[in-house]
Amino acid sequence: MAMDIETLLDLEKLYSAIMTYFDNPLTLLIVVATIIIVLIVIVWITKMVIDLAPYAYVNARIRSKEAKLFDDAKLNELIESGSLEELVGLLEDTDYGQYVIEVMNELKDPVAVEKALDMYLADLYGLIYRISPDSAKKVLKVFAKKFDIKNIKTLIRAKFVGLSAEETYALLIPLGNIPVEKLKELAEVKTVEEVVRGLDGTEYFKILQEELSNYDQTSNIIGFELALDKYYLESLRKTIMTEGKEEDIFREFVGTIIDVENLKVILKGKADGLSAEELSKYVTLTGYELADWKLKDLMSAGGIEGVLSGLEGTSYAEVLAEAMEEYEKTKSIYAFEKALDKFVLEKGKKLSTRKPFGVGPIIGLIVSKELEVKNLKAIIKGKIENLKPEEIRSLLISL
């Protein structure tokens, strides 16, 4: 039916014309509903594309990094290497090559090697941060605080054992939020107390100052380290307490990390005979799966067996129960720490597939690389200490 412009402008005639085609009102209703549904789908797809587009480039870069992760064959090759020099040769064509080669003359020093690998991680974090969209940067920036924390711990340990300024600075990683000039200045001081005072004006000063009286009484620096770990986890938790789908993924990941680190503190505390009151100073409440009341129950539990019993019904019960046999043989908390680190790895991998075109791959790469570096440190340390291949394998977190 041909319609001229005047007819189109006449709403009544337009209605009549439409009804000529759709003499059944139900047919018209179906057509209108279909149009609305199509529009909703178009809007949803458009929004999804807009949300995911910023991750296209970063995820392409991350996939290329993931492709270079060590498989079991590569790890076995490193473990079976005949010497440190041979091991470094095997690493030469990997992402770690340039970092390890720089400390070839210090290969017998596990601290120098550890610093080289930490430098790799720091550079990786820097790369991911630079290429990530703003929705991910706020959490990645807090993750990068771990290098500040590591430097502060190193400064405190160095001054506790009386290292010189030169020896101290050689151990630091010149990355993070603390300026390099400030790190040099802190390396020059003589005592632990001076390190704390030198951090006045930074976000870390208050928590360290609160631990000074405990240090004065016990001459034990573990309180500083636990307080810093707690502060780091609380910073992560505060950052991800926002709305949004990307933050939901980060929230689950960070919450799991908080659960795991809390369990490490509690298990170590039980092994060392700490009271619930002492433990509560260093446990970060509100993780992902472990509620505040559950953490308080675990801190009050009787020994390690009591902690494991108190975890019944959680995702961590089976993980730690499987590690109990190794703990009973070795009497080392490392058996539990290794099992919990593996749990975090598996969680990261699951989350990376849940949001494969968004923030998921970022989480997957971070957790995979951190545990790969832990394994590398264990292999190199094992070679330095002349451990047998099977002994080195027992230290690794399976990937």
From Swiss-Prot:
Catalytic temperature dependence: Optimum temperature is 80 degrees Celsius.
Record carries keyword Plastid: no
Keyword annotations: ATP synthesis, Cell membrane, Hydrogen ion transport, Ion transport, Membrane, Transport
Gene3D superfamilies: ATP synthase (C/AC39) subunit, domain 3 (1.10.132.50), V-type ATP synthase subunit C domain (1.20.1690.10)
Membrane topology: Peripheral membrane protein
InterPro entries the UniProt entry points to: ATPase_csu/dsu_sf, ATPase_V0-cplx_csu, ATPase_V0-cplx_csu/dsu, V-ATPase_V0D/AC39_subunit, V-type_ATPase_csu/dsu, V-type_ATPase_csu/dsu_dom_3
The UniProt record lists the keyword Iron-sulfur: no
Broad class of where this protein is predominantly found: membrane
pH dependence (UniProt free text): Optimum pH is 6.0 for ATP hydrolysis.
Location in or out of the cell: Cell membrane
GO molecular function terms attached to this record: ATP binding; proton-transporting ATP synthase activity, rotational mechanism; proton-transporting ATPase activity, rotational mechanism
GO cellular component: plasma membrane; proton-transporting V-type ATPase, V0 domain
A Pfam family this chain is assigned to: vATP-synt_AC39
GO biological process, one term: proton motive force-driven plasma membrane ATP synthesis
Its biological purpose: Component of the A-type ATP synthase that produces ATP from ADP in the presence of a proton gradient across the membrane.
Subunit structure: The A-type ATPase is composed of subunits A(3), B(3), C, D, E(1 or 2), F, H(2), I and K(x).
Domain notes per entry: Purified ATP synthase is 25.9 nm long. The hydrophilic A1 domain is 9.4 X 11.5 nm, the central stalk is 8.0 X 3.9 nm and the membrane-bound A0 domain is 6.4 X 10.6 nm; the domains are connected by two stalks. ATP is synthesized or hydrolyzed by the A1 domain while ion translocation occurs via the A0 domain.
HAMAP family in the cross-refs: ATP_synth_C_arch (MF_00314)
Family of the protein in this entry: Belongs to the V-ATPase V0D/AC39 subunit family.
NCBIfam families to which the protein is assigned, alphabetical: AhaC, PRK01198.1-3
Protein name from the UniProt record: A-type ATP synthase subunit C
Organism taxonomic ancestry: Archaea, Methanobacteriati, Methanobacteriota, Methanomada group, Methanococci
